[in-house]
Amino acid sequence: MARTFAQFRGVTKAIVGIGRWAAAQSTVYDAATERERRALHRQGVSAEVSGVFVTPDGDTPPTALNDRMIGVSAAQLRAIDEVVAVPYETVKAPAVRAALRSRLVGSLVTHTSLARALLETDTRTGPGTADVG
């Protein structure tokens, strides 16, 4: 496993998913216990990017669940030259916005309705501004 993790330093491109911190919107959420879900909600988590937890403002707080997960860290993900997210479902717009604010993701490949949802309303700055940070 150590050899695998050592390979992270050489990764130059990554394709990631974005999960909304809700049932059936994140595989991590669905695998977490109810206690873990509540704890992350209390920390303000609204999204996850490949297991990295994200708040609406784009912060990536350390969590107790991080200590038990095997995967890339926020710092490792940010060190990758090109990170492309492939989110699906309009309901994930706030999670996608949080992921973009976190600087974990640099590019999106998505469908028209989610793209429109991202462009039409930004919860921090109002309609039509699409400010992601």
Predicted features and spans:
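Conserved phosphate- and dinucleotide-binding cores of soluble alpha/beta proteins
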Residues: 1-133
